[in-house]
Amino acid sequence: MDPIIAATHADPYPYYAKLRAEGGLTFDHGIKLWVASSARAVCAVLAHAECRVRPLQEPVPKAIAAGMAGNVFGQLMRMNDGERQRCPRAAIEPSLQLIDDDQVRALVAARLMTADADGLYKAMFRGPVGVVATLLGFTPAQGRAISELTADFVACLSPLSNDLQLAAAHAAAEQLRGYFIELLAEPPSDLLKAIGQRLDGDEETLIANLIGLCSQTFEATAGLIGNALIALRRQPELRNASMDALLAEVQRFDPSVQNTRRFVAQSCEIDGVRLEAGEVILVLLASANRDPLLNAEPERFLLDRPNRRSFSFGSGRHQCPGQALALSIAAATVREILDQGMNLQQLTWHYRPSLNGRIPLFSAVQP
């Protein structure tokens, strides 16, 4: 086991506890990265001004820099620090808060869902982006196309993608850009109007970050839904519990984003450790969530957990602006899956290959 393999391991949490016991911020000679595993170290890294989301010398990964996916990547607020992060965020974050949970539930319920493996896959990997696309003003048919294209686009965010997948990501970025250019020429939806009124930037920045909103929805929400179903399979007595409460604990207990990275821009000291410019820190968000100094009885799955604290959606200036929306879509989707009568005890799964995500892929589903 190492801190990267852990993300898709059947049960990485005892290993994370071992890492925390060895020190909150330590160097792993096997993967040649600093590893932040304690809540204190994770908080310090995420808050530090010299810890950037991309290396200074490579703001866009070389593998995609020459194509449209790289062009979009370079403008994403989640992949930038400073003004290129703050300006789009200031437009998108408050606008997302205007979305009503009832509206989300209605959009999820309107989708045709079948109680089989294919239906479950679509509910996890296509439905959530379709909801966001509809909120932005696309028709249901366009929303389905946006979902498919987003699935291709997110390949550009993973170092595990091959040349074929990266070529598909570039093509998807081109097509998504075309869809958004057409959308912006139409009278805007309430959500798009709110974002446009707040944005201090050009149309290309807006389009890139709307694509980014779809891609973050795709990645975060699929894992939330899947890990909630696993929690319900293990604790079937929770089927009738509040889905909002269930998802709030799932995102802490078994998050879909297990780790992130930070790149040291200038030599600095973090949590008593000296780091040099150019070094890389693997930030174990999922480990910090299980730190007893952050949450009492962290190994227990408690729906009524008092003062729940979590790093699953980041922290500080890069905290995910779509957290409430992702949780709302996931809660509505899980409830819809349960209402379809799916037998969770017959689910089998493995985790999608990833360096940082914990997203189950289900099979052998019987109605």
Please place each PLM-identified region on the residue numbering.
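Cytochrome P450 catalytic core segment centered on helix I
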Residues: 148-200
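Conserved cytochrome P450 K-helix E-x-x-R motif and the immediately C-terminal K′/meander segment
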Residues: 186, 240-273
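Cytochrome P450 C-terminal beta-domain/meander region
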Residues: 197-203, 261-282
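Cytochrome P450 catalytic-core helices
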Residues: 206-241, 321-342
